Swiss-Prot record:
PROSITE patterns: GREAB_1. This is Transcription elongation factor GreB. The keyword Oxidoreductase does not apply. Necessary for efficient RNA polymerase transcription elongation past template-encoded arresting sites. The arresting sites in DNA have the property of trapping a certain fraction of elongating RNA polymerases that pass through, resulting in locked ternary complexes. Cleavage of the nascent transcript by cleavage factors such as GreA or GreB allows the resumption of elongation from the new 3'terminus. GreB releases sequences of up to 9 nucleotides in length. Belongs to the GreA/GreB family. GreB subfamily.
Length: 163
């Protein structure tokens, strides 16, 4: 995602990123620094597994800290609970669907850092979300996939808290 693209995120998603950053900066990184310092004092670093693993893990943590910091700086927090009631689908909507095969499904349209298929959280830039956005309750939308075309009916649109 480029820096010009807005990073829409729900309050819960923003808090999850913030919590992960706190955990890395205040817990994991200090522990790894301590291990690396201890291992460095054990002599030859070229064959010192604790030292080599610790340095590699510290690089991974530092990379993740930079990533999370940038994502939080670019975040545009959108609270679905504060949205005016509407039957139109936008970011943060919880949408009830009727799929082509007759099964009902509920999806929550969230930020790209919040995707969780087990909880039916889909990114606002996913193909399904793109065909739903701006449609209204009762509308039928068409989702084109590599497997073919699927018609989906929008059964409900709600703006409720997304955990």
């Amino acid at each position: 995602m480029s820096t010009e693209t807005k990073n829409y995120i729900t309050p819960a998603g923003w808090q999850a990123l913030k919590d992960e950053l706190y955990q890395l900066v205040n817990k994991e990184r200090p522990e790894i620094v301590q291990i690396v310092n201890w291992a460095a004092g054990n002599g030859d670093r070229s064959e010192n597994g604790d030292y080599l693993y610790g340095k590699r893990r510290m690089r991974e943590i530092d990379r993740r800290i930079r990533f999370l910091t940038k994502r939080l700086e670019a975040a545009v927090v959108v609270d679905p609970e504060l949205r005016e009631a509407t039957d139109q689908v936008f970011f943060g909507a919880t949408v009830g669907l009727l799929r082509d095969d007759g099964r009902e499904q509920t999806v929550k349209i969230v930020g790209i850092d919040e995707i969780d298929t087990a909880q039916n959280k889909i990114s606002w830039i996913s193909p399904l979300a793109r065909c739903l956005i701006k449609a209204r309750e009762g509308d039928e939308v068409v989702l084109n996939t590599p497997e073919g075309r699927e018609e989906i009916e929008i059964l409900s649109v709600e703006y409720i808290k997304i955990d």
